[in-house]
């Protein structure tokens, strides 16, 4: 049987990826250890290549690239205003989101820049039901659903500014902030909770450099620092027995949990011609992650679980652009090493008789993640219309080695899964406007849960609790109820001439 603490540790590492916006993932690497269906909450910037599998290494995305590496704004050929309403839903009423991003891109003779704002609604389809055993027919625990716990509003803002230093070199800097009242799926992380009030923020700063090395060879470099901070006020309804009145009572208990993660990263890309109208080159990314505080979710019986991670991203891209035809392929390998640990809150005696003091490590976890990503896309755009097709495939493998200091036990666990993301799009072009639709569907993820036959009766209502971005996994073998994620984005672009 899989150990409860082992699965809890796997989930803790999976939870760290929540702070990474998908649209900024070029320089920040998400850590994922379980195949949870994730919505596109952080898709808050327009993208020309979204329907082409989001290929990016050797095929430019002039709308998204400047927000990833601000110096790439030097490649803008004209100023434009863009509106990109985005909608996503997770199959099985597991959540949905609606976002309205507005962006402006400016290109001058020497200076260039851009700004983007977005307003978002996160919809909790299921709510957060309370699961409490009723001791008798006289106790009715049915509670009205809190409307303020169902939906939440988030706001985002980002911008960049750059300068063409010469005909070959450009420099840029950018920043992004977000005010969050919900991270999709967190409501289901706390088993048995009646309501969850979330409040937090994200801030991100980055700088970039782009250089033409001659003969159409290009070097791109970017550095980024990203911080995520959330507070969770979680309310529980608990049944207690009053010996004086000889009756049961329901009381409300509120817990405050903190979620903190910071990431510092370096991103490099080199591309060069490899034939007529073809480009290719390697990419390399390194992230140093610090996890000073991860929330104590309802299943987590070992609180105060800090950690550190080193994540790498290395790959190669191939791109082709000839007339109306565009084609791109990305192949990326991601190795990640992560260490987390639990610290004793009080004095603890090990099974061997050693006395651990407060602050000493009680559990040590060593993770190795091995991920492989393949993205390809093709599109054809004429002066009036166009289409795009894409496919993304990802292989995820996780190895965990856990040392329980208190019980002197060592455990190992391996997890693996595949994800598939087909995408498609259409383009209509007018003399003074462009309308672009992109849709994609992610399969291979869903709602992980524990096999009922192996569920422990001592667990507190933690069976099959899954969310859009996270998972609480109780003790026992895991099974997967697949839930597709479907995303639609409609972009309207108006050139500013």
Predicted regions and their residues:
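Residues on the lipid-exposed face of transmembrane beta-strands in outer-membrane beta-barrel proteins
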Residues: 52, 102-108, 157-163, 205-211, ...
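Extracellular loop and loop/strand-boundary signature of outer-membrane beta-barrel proteins
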Residues: 142-147, 188-197, 244, 249-257, ...
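Residues that define the transmembrane beta-barrel architecture of outer-membrane proteins
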Residues: 64, 94-100, 151-157, 199-205, ...
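Transmembrane beta-strands of outer-membrane beta-barrel pores
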Residues: 56-58, 85-91, 117-123, 175-181, ...
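Outer-membrane beta-barrel "beta-signal"
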Residues: 426-433, 468-469, 474, 480-497
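Outer-membrane beta-barrel translocator domains and adjoining extracellular loop/strand segments
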Residues: 94-97, 125-134, 178-195, 231-247, ...
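Transmembrane beta-barrel wall of Gram-negative outer-membrane proteins
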Residues: 95-233, 237, 250-253, 261-279
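N-terminal, post-signal peptide beta-strand-biased segments of exported outer-membrane/organellar beta-barrel
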Residues: 25-128, 149, 415, 440-443
């Amino acid at each position: 049987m899989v150990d409860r603490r082992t699965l809890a540790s796997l989930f803790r590492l999976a939870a760290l990826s929540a702070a990474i916006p998908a649209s900024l993932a070029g320089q920040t690497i998400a850590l994922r250890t379980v195949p949870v269906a994730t919505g596109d909450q952080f898709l808050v910037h327009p993208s020309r290549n979204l329907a082409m599998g989001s290929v990016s290494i050797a095929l430019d995305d002039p709308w998204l690239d400047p927000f990833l590496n601000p110096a790439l704004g030097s490649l803008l050929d004209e100023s434009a205003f863009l509106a990109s309403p985005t909608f996503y839903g997770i199959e099985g009423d597991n959540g949905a989101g609606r976002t309205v991003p507005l962006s402006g891109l400016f290109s001058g003779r020497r200076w260039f820049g851009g700004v983007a704002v977005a307003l978002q609604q996160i919809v909790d389809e299921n709510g957060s039901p309370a699961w409490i055993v009723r001791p008798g027919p006289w106790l009715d625990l049915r509670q009205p659903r809190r409307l303020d716990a169902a939906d939440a509003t988030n706001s985002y803002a980002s911008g960049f500014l750059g300068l063409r230093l010469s005909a070959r070199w450009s420099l840029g800097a950018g920043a992004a902030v977000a005010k969050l009242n919900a991270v999709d799926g967190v409501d289901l992380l706390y088993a048995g909770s009646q309501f969850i009030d979330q409040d937090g923020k994200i801030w991100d700063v980055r700088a970039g450099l782009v250089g033409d090395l001659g003969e159409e060879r290009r070097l791109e470099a970017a550095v980024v620092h990203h911080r995520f901070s959330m507070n969770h006020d979680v309310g529980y309804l608990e049944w207690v027995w009053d010996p004086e009145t000889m009756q049961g009572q329901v009381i409300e208990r509120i817990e405050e949990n903190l979620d903190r993660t910071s990431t510092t990263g370096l991103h490099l890309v080199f591309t060069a011609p490899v034939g007529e109208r073809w480009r290719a080159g390697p990419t390399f990314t390194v992230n140093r992650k610090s996890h000073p505080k991860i929330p104590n979710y309802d299943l987590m019986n070992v609180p105060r679980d800090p950690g550190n991670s080193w994540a790498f991203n290395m790959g190669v891209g191939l791109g082709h652009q000839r007339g109306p035809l565009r084609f791109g392929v990305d192949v990326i390998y991601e190795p990640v090493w992560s260490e987390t640990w639990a610290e004793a809150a009080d004095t603890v005696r090990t099974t061997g008789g050693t006395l651990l003091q407060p602050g000493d490590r009680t559990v040590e976890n060593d993770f190795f993640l091995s991920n492989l990503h393949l993205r390809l896309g093709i599109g054809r755009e004429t002066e009036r219309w166009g289409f795009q097709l894409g496919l993304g495939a990802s292989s995820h493998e996780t190895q965990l080695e856990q040392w329980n200091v208190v019980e002197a036990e060592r455990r190992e666990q391996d997890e693996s899964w595949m994800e598939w993301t087909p995408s498609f799009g259409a383009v209509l072009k007018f003399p003074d406007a462009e309308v672009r639709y992109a849709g994609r569907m992610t399969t291979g993820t869903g709602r992980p849960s524990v096999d009922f036959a192996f569920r422990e009766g001592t667990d507190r209502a933690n069976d099959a609790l899954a969310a859009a971005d996270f998972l609480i996994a109780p003790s026992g073998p895991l099974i997967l109820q697949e839930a597709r994620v479907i995303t639609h984005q409609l972009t309207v672009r108006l050139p500013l001439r």
